Amino acid sequence: MGQKIHPFGFRLSVQKNWSSRWYANSNNFPAMLSSDIKVREFLKKKLAHAAVSKIVIERPAKNAKITIYSARPGIVIGKKGEDIESLRSGLQGLMGVPVHLNIEEVRKPEIDATLIAESIAQQLEKRVMFRRAMKRAMQNAMRLGAQGIKIMSSGRLNGIEIARTEWYREGRVPLHTLRADIDYGVAEAKTTYGIIGIKVWVFKGEVFGNKIEQAAQPAEPEKKVRKSGAKNAATS
């Protein structure tokens, strides 16, 4: 189960929290869920170059509070706060309620799974060799304190005729251990050969109460190649 299920959904009742935090009755739920999806798509489009890791949406009493976690908060805020005011007005138009925006800085983007996946996707779009991009990302993550990392790429890697899946792992990535703090991220690289999907799992330690166990000695990197048909080229 741990190998197939989404790592966040598997750990929601143990250590992870929801990205949308509000309550709605059965009549209002579809509209509010649709609004959340539109907000995330709007922010993803507007902040494509701001290295956004996570967006948390809360709805207290006829208001909305949106927290954006970014490795480049200066790009989100803009000169003298102009960009963030433009974002706020756009979000208020989408949601129909007053919106409060908070910007949180991601201090270690090298061990953030979403930012790692997006970085690899950008490199693949610039025709960097996928193995080089994956290994460089793994080395940076292990150097900055990750206990383990696994990166998977799927599609027409290096422009080959038949799509395949290739992954590398360094250290431990215990997906079935509920107390393991696993960060997970996905991205798509739109290359001239088609879409290449990237998935990243980062193991940051085991959670005991509010404490995370520190990193142990890293293991040797592991590589595995699995060939698949073209219909499995891209990952979601």
From Swiss-Prot:
Disordered: annotated span: 215-236
Might you name a Gene Ontology BP term for this protein?
translation
Give the residues annotated as coiled coil: none
Could you list this entry's UniProt keywords, alphabetically sorted.
Ribonucleoprotein, Ribosomal protein, RNA-binding, rRNA-binding
SMART domains assigned to the protein according to its UniProt record, in alphabetical order: KH (SM00322)
Chain ranges of the KH type-2 domain: 39-107
Question: CDD domains from the entry?
Answer: KH-II_30S_S3 (cd02412)
Q: Name one GO cellular component term.
A: cytosolic small ribosomal subunit
**Alphabetized GO MF terms:** mRNA binding; rRNA binding; structural constituent of ribosome
Q: Which InterPro entries match?
A: KH_dom, KH_dom-like_a/b, KH_dom_type_2, KH_sf_prok-type, Ribosomal_S3_C_sf, Ribosomal_uS3_bac-typ, Ribosomal_uS3_C, Ribosomal_uS3_CS
Quaternary structure note = Part of the 30S ribosomal subunit. Forms a tight complex with proteins S10 and S14.
Q: Describe the task this protein carries out.
A: Binds the lower part of the 30S subunit head. Binds mRNA in the 70S ribosome, positioning it for translation.
Q: Which PANTHER family match?
A: 30S/40S RIBOSOMAL PROTEIN S3, SMALL RIBOSOMAL SUBUNIT PROTEIN US3C
Protein family: Belongs to the universal ribosomal protein uS3 family.
Q: What is this protein called?
A: Small ribosomal subunit protein uS3
Annotated organism of origin: Methylobacillus flagellatus (strain ATCC 51484 / DSM 6875 / VKM B-1610 / KT)
Q: What is the lineage of its organism?
A: Bacteria, Pseudomonadati, Pseudomonadota, Betaproteobacteria, Nitrosomonadales
